[in-house]
Design a protein with these regions (language model features):
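Terminal, regulation- and interaction-focused segments at domain boundaries
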Residues: 2-38
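Sequence-level motif detector for i,i+2 pairs with an aromatic at +2
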Residues: 11-12, 59-61, 97
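A generic alpha-helix structural signal
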Residues: 27-31, 76, 124, 128-131
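Beta-strand/loop substructures that line and gate deep hydrophobic ligand-binding cavities in soluble
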Residues: 89-117
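Well-ordered alpha/beta subsegment
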Residues: 112-137
Length: 137
């Protein structure tokens, strides 16, 4: 795996960070980090498992939906359309070469997309640090 690398798909506001862990380890570590921060895991969607149950195959992908109503609610009150993208989400995916990535919408993209007031962007900006910590050794 190696040192965490980052990538940004600026056109769509998607940030990606390469994990130094395997897929399962990355998912578990991320779950532990959000719990330690007092955040709630609202949903864990196993796209690969769902595909398998439908008789299909796909690379490993899991979407983690998490947040805290104390942080998200003021954002949604100020910018109601932000509820389309909140709670926050992180996609953990594994590529054919075994490299594991964590992907998320950049806070700046979400702020621009929904007109989130600058004083509330901090409520969603912590995702970058969480993903960085989950990807690192």
């Amino acid at each position: 795996m190696g040192v965490a690398r980052t990538g940004l798909n600026r056109g769509q506001g998607i940030e990606r960070v390469a994990s130094t862990r395997g897929f399962d380890e990355t998912v578990v570590h991320f779950e532990q980090l959000i719990a330690a921060k007092g955040l709630m895991l609202f949903a864990k969607i196993d796209f690969t498992g769902d595909a398998k149950r439908a008789g299909l195959t796909m690379p490993r992908m899991m979407l983690l939906v998490f947040g805290n109503p104390k942080g998200g609610t003021p954002v949604m009150v100020a910018a109601p359309s932000s509820a389309l993208d909140l709670p926050l989400k992180v996609l953990v995916s594994e590529e054919a070469d075994g490299e594991v990535w964590l992907s998320f919408n950049s806070p700046e993209y979400l702020a621009q997309r929904h007109g989130i007031p600058s004083e509330l962007v901090a409520n969603i900006a912590g995702i970058r640090g969480l993903v960085g910590a989950a990807a690192a050794n």
